[in-house]
Amino acid sequence: MGNGMCSRKQKRIFQTLLLLTVVFGFLYGAMLYLELQTQLRKAEAVALKYQQHQDSLSAQLQVVYEHRSRLEKSLQKERLEHKKAKEDFLVYKLEAQETLNKGRQDSNSRYSALNVQHQMLKSQHEELRKQHSDLEEEHRKQGEDFSRAFNDHKQRYLQLQQEKEQELSKLKETVYNLREENRQLRKAHQDIHTQLQDVKTQVAEYKQLKDTLNRIPSFRNPDPAEQQNVTFTHGTHPPQGYNVREKLTGELQEGQQNHDAMPRRMEEKPLSSMQKEAGFQALEEQNQVEPREPEGRQVEEEHRKALEEEEMEQVGQAEHLEEEHDPSPEEQDREWRDQRRQNAAHLLDGRPQAEIEHSTKAATNFRSPYEEQLEQQRLAARRDEEAQRLREHQEALHQQRLHGQLLRQQQQQQYLAREMAQQKQADHEEGQQQYQLRQQAHSDAVENDVAQGAEDQGIPEEEGGAYDRDNQRQDEAEGDPGNRQEFHEPGHQEGDPEAEADRAAAQDINPADDPNNQGEDEFEEAEQVREENLPEESEERKQSEAKQGNVEMDEHLVMAGNPDQQEDNVDEQYQEEGEEEVQEDLTEEKKRELEHNAEETYGENPDDKNNDVEEQGVPNRAHPKGRQEHYEEEEDEEDGAAVAEKSHRRAEM
């Protein structure tokens, strides 16, 4: 039994372990599957990205291949033309052997002059660089001064803003203190108003009593002494310019004391009927005088309101004081009236006790609790309204301050954006000016080369052309279009004496000047053929100039389109110079061989040579300019081939 139980337990344990391993294996497989799915999605995204990149590269490569095919076609065409020009040039070399040495000497002298001019232009270029560095330093100093001034103004602005905020907080404190004082004065005015209502009830009772006493005939004729007392009481006037705010509490206490002492005096001193009548007469005269007295106080009230309005406007919160009833002058009048009435009441101490008790009871029970509650609610509503007005004013001031700050920030941002736009526009204009200068210098160089080639007819300027190309490439490597323009202008000016020398050399090899030729008819026929061939030569010259201009414009566009290509100009120039030197050496060797062969043939058969010259006189005279044009086209083709090779190499890069 024990073994069976153990085996069952072990079996259950094994089953649970197996189940757990299966579950964990399933979970691990699910996690591995999810991880592989995520990696697969990432790999698909990367593959899609690389596929798009490959498509873009293939499109770019297709464009490059198309450009390469066009360049190869143009190169093949130029090679054919170059081959044809070389054949013509070899024929031309035999005839131009004598003029070659002279052309070399002229080209050497020209090269020395151009070299001197090049050194001068280099010195000018260094001076311009120094001036540029000085201007950059001055610009940097001005920028530092501007930043310093801007920081100073910013600090000053922040300081002024802090000072204004402090002043504003102080003004708010003063406004709060003035409001507290106004609230206290309103409270005091409310107390005095309640006392005034009590006194009004007493005055009404006094009038009733006076009417009853006037009906009695014994009280209608007072004694002269009593009239003097009445006039004496009538002669007491209220004090003018009495300050309520300073003596308000003292008057209230005095009024309380007089009001409390009035019943006691009535009980202690019974007055005669004449004194009562005199008191009532004094009250009547007081009521007649009292309407005149507020006129003087009204002026003081208006003056005081104007002063308070000015104080409120300085704080930034001008309030309409007409809406807020300020009762300080009225309180003054009422206090004075109460005092007069109390003085008159002292004369009426002899009236019956029942009337006095009735009047005091009416005075004490005049204001009901409902009226007091309404008055308290009115005061609370007024205080809430004032607090709400103060909060609204503070919120308006805060919003105004925030609006001002936002406006200042917007103005500052607009100023900075305007400065950035002006700077960008200036940079853009400067770049356009530089590009126009480079383009103008390039076009001037092309025109000068074309004019110089047209003037130098009959001179194979192989070495001189190589020197000019070297100098031109050096100027382009230096990247100074102004120097390149000045470099070609003296060359154009110096072309006139060289052209005259070339014409003299061409006239030397003219068959008309040859002593062996004696046929004048042949010379006339040659002149006629030359005149007929002039239009054809002009057309060919125009075509060659247009072709040369197109090649140079393509080169300029390629150089301007890719700024990285401009950095490789110097290395390519050195390579091209080396290749040209090798080609020049080969051509010089061929020239020597041809000269040697020509001398041998001339020494063996001089008559045949003369005959050949006579036979070739007409075509030589007819095509001297054509050969020169072929020579110039050969140079242009060499330049175009070099440019095509450069562009092809850059396209491959």
UniProtKB/Swiss-Prot annotation:
Q: Where is the composition biased (Basic and acidic residues)?
A: 123-143, 261-270, 290-307, 319-328, 348-360, 381-398, 466-505, 527-545, 588-599
> Where are the compositionally biased (Low complexity) regions?
399-423
- Highest taxon of source: Eukaryota
Which residues are modified by glycosylation? 229
How does the record describe the protein's post-translational processing? Phosphorylated by c-AMP-dependent kinases most probably in its lumenal part. O-glycosylated; modified by sialic acid residues.
Q: Where is this region: Golgi targeting?
A: 38-107, 176-220
- Membrane as UniProt keyword: yes
Q: Point out residues bearing the modification Phosphotyrosine.
A: 574, 631
Which residues are modified by lipidation (N-myristoyl glycine)? 2
Q: Which residues form a coiled coil?
A: 66-216
Q: In which tissues is it expressed?
A: Expressed in liver, pancreas and pituitary (at protein level).
Residues covered by region (Disordered): 122-143, 253-653
Residues in compartment: Lumenal: 34-653
Functionally, this protein is described as follows: Plays a role in endosome to Golgi protein trafficking; mediates protein transport along the late endosome-bypass pathway from the early endosome to the Golgi.
What protein name applies here?
A: Golgi integral membrane protein 4
Gene transcribed to yield this protein? Golim4
